[in-house]
Amino acid sequence: MAQRKIIHVDCDCFYAAVEMRDDPSLRDVPLAVGGEGGRGVVTTCNYRARAFGVRSAMPGSEARRLCPGLVTVPPDMGRYRAVSQQVMAILREMTDLVEPLSLDEAFLDVTDVDAFKGSATLMARHLRERVSREVGITISAGVAPNKFLAKIASDWRKPDGLFVITPPEVADFVSELPVEKLFGVGQVTAARLHALGVKTCGDMQALGADVLIEKFGKQGYRLFEMAHGRDNRPVVVSRVAKSVSVERTFSQDLPDRSACDTVMPALVADLNLRLSRKGQHKPIHKLFVKIRYSDFSTHTLERVRESVTEPALVDFQPLLEELMPKDRPVRLLGVGVRFRNDDAPVTQLRLFD
C-alpha cells in the first residue's frame, strides 16, 4: 500500500483576511471581526491585533483595553461563504478527495495524484499560490502522512506558511511535540498528563499504552497512537451520518449569554456548510445546542423541528435561551441536527454543485 500523502490547508485569520482584501484601508490597522457593542465578542482578528494580545472569543471590551486602536467590523457570513467556495473549488481541482472541516480549512488526500510528479509539497505550494493570486487571501498548509500530523504542520509556520513532515521525520518530530498539541488534549487532560510526568509525546511513549489506558480508558489508546504519530483516519468526502454538528472550544471563556449570541451566527453558518459538503439531504428530525461551562459540566438540549430544511440562527436561539437561563462562563458552544431514523435513500451530491 502506498504511503499516504495528506495536505491540510487553513486560511489565515479568514474572516479578517476577507475584510482586509475588500477594504484596503483595514490592512495596516489592528482589526477584529465580531460584535461592536459593549458585550460583543471577537470572532477573529488579524495578526496586528494578535500582537497586542487580542484573541478569538475575547470580550470586545477587553480587546479594546489591550488594543485601544482596534477597529471592529461586524461579520458578513454570506461573503465569507462565497470566498470559502472559491477556495474549496481550487482545492478540488487538485483532487476529488477533499474533506472541508469548516469555512476556512480542509484536508486533501493527494496520494494518487500525478500532478507535480506526485510531490505533495509542490502541490501544496501550487495551491497556496493559486489561492493568493485568484482569491486574494493567504492560506497555510501542512503536508504529512496522515491527517493528525498534517493539521499540526499547517499551524507550524502560520501565517502564510508551508511545513512538511516526511515519513522518515515523523518519529523525531513527535518525540518533542508537547502533549497540548494533540487533538482532544485540553487543559484538564494536559494537567493529568503533567501529573504523570508526561510533557511530550516522547514522555507518553515511554509511559506506555497500558498505563495510559488504565488512566484514561479508550482515550488512552488514542493518545498512545497519536504520540507515535499514527492516524489511520481517511479523508472523507461524504458519509451517511445520524447527525451533523459543529462546536467550538474557546481559549478564553465566553462571559455570558450575550457573548454566546455573538458567536452563534458563525456556528450556524459552519453547520450549514458542513451539511452541504456532506451532500446529505436526509430529513432533519431534531436541532440541538450543546454547552460546556467553565466548570466542565456539559449540557445539551434538543427539540423536534421536522419542518426545518436549512437550519437558521432563529431556529437555535430559543434552544440557547432555554438551555442557558442565566449568565455563566461558557467554555464550549455547539449546534447540530439529527436526522430522521428511516431507511429512505440518501441523495449524495457533488460538493459545491
From Swiss-Prot:
Record key words, sorted: Cytoplasm, DNA damage, DNA repair, DNA replication, DNA-binding, DNA-directed DNA polymerase, Magnesium, Metal-binding, Mutator protein, Nucleotidyltransferase, Transferase
Top-level lineage group: Bacteria
Catalytic reaction list: DNA(n) + a 2'-deoxyribonucleoside 5'-triphosphate = DNA(n+1) + diphosphate
Cofactor annotation remark: Binds 2 magnesium ions per subunit.
Swiss-Prot/TrEMBL cofactor(s): Mg(2+)
GO molecular function, one term: magnesium ion binding
Localisation: Cytoplasm
Residues holding Mg(2+): 10, 104
Signal peptide region: none
Keyword hit for DNA repair: yes
Chain ranges of the UmuC domain: 6-186
Annotated Pfam families: IMS (PF00817), IMS_C (PF11799), IMS_HHH_1 (PF21999)
Main location: cytoplasm
GO cellular component, one term: cytosol
Site (Substrate discrimination): 15
UniProt-listed InterPro entries: DNA/RNA_pol_sf, DNA_pol_Y-fam_lit_finger_sf, DNA_pol_Y-fam_little_finger, DNA_polymerase-Y, DNApol_IV, IMS_HHH_1, Rev_trsase/Diguanyl_cyclase, UmuC
Gene Ontology biological process terms, A to Z: DNA-templated DNA replication; error-prone translesion synthesis; SOS response
Residues annotated as catalytic: 105
Enzyme Commission no: 2.7.7.7
Protein family per UniProt: Belongs to the DNA polymerase type-Y family.
HAMAP family on file: DNApol_IV
Chain's role: Poorly processive, error-prone DNA polymerase involved in untargeted mutagenesis. Copies undamaged DNA at stalled replication forks, which arise in vivo from mismatched or misaligned primer ends. These misaligned primers can be extended by PolIV. Exhibits no 3'-5' exonuclease (proofreading) activity. May be involved in translesional synthesis, in conjunction with the beta clamp from PolIII.
Assembly notes: Monomer.
Stated name of the protein: DNA polymerase IV
